[in-house]
């Protein structure tokens, strides 16, 4: 029992930031808070942040409004427009901003890399920077280069890691998908990052959910592979329906 309590206390000491309060960011941040982490959701949209502070949820997901209010009241869920203000208190920063399609169909990483630049400009201690957004293979390395460039311009040497933790949430079932996952995929490139991500997902380990560690490119590819498989299944079913 004391071993279990010790692990839970370790998790309760986790402070994380989620950048982006869209569907993925808000659901993920709220669920992490529900599991006991201290979470700050960040968005540049001041009206959205003010609305969230007042209990106005900008998306519809069954049960989310109640969960947000419960965790705000408990002091585990916070909202801000100032990412730099939380960088010295958090252990992990999740990037969950939008990646709209360019004209050629490729993912536009502008917002992702803007967040990375801001992190590099404001961080003063070790952080793990994690992509939650759906991004192409190689994005983590672009984030790493962007952060390092910002640090170089400041003439400071601060250690950090990047990681990939793609989401597999279905609208309408997102809370259950997060709290009772079929699998959690985490891509890391250092033991230090792995230890922090293990601490964060410790409740999943305790409940015997599958938490799968791999290298970062494999984690990035896993999300695209899952999306492609879903699209293939839908196309196949449509073709069969046309034949029948």
Locations of regions flagged by a protein language model:
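Structural/interface elements that position substrates and couple domains in central-metabolism enzymes
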Residues: 9-244
């Amino acid at each position: 029992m004391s071993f279990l309590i010790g692990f839970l206390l370790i998790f309760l000491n986790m402070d994380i930031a989620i950048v982006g309060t869209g569907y993925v960011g808000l659901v993920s941040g709220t669920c992490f808070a529900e599991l006991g982490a201290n979470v700050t959701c960040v968005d540049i949209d001041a009206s959205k942040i003010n609305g969230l502070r007042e209990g106005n949820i900008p998306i519809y997901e069954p049960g989310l409004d109640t969960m947000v209010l419960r965790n705000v009241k408990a002091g585990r869920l916070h909202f801000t427009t100032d990412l730099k203000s939380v960088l010295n208190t958090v252990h992990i920063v999740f990037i969950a901003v939008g990646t709209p399609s360019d004209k050629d169909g490729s993912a536009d990483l502008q917002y992702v890399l803007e967040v990375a630049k801001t992190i590099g400009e404001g961080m003063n201690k070790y952080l793990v920077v994690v992509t939650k957004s759906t991004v192409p293979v190689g994005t983590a390395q672009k984030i790493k280069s962007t952060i390092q460039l910002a640090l170089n311009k400041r003439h400071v040497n601060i250690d950090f890691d990047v990681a990939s933790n793609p989401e597999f949430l279905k609208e309408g079932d997102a809370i259950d998908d997060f709290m009772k996952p079929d699998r959690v995929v985490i891509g890391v490139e250092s033991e230090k990052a792995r230890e922090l991500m293990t601490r964060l997902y410790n409740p999943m380990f305790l409940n015997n959910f599958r938490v799968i560690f791999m290298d970062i490119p494999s984690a990035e590819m896993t999300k695209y592979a899952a999306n492609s498989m879903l699209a293939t299944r839908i196309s196949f079913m449509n073709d069969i329906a046309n034949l029948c």
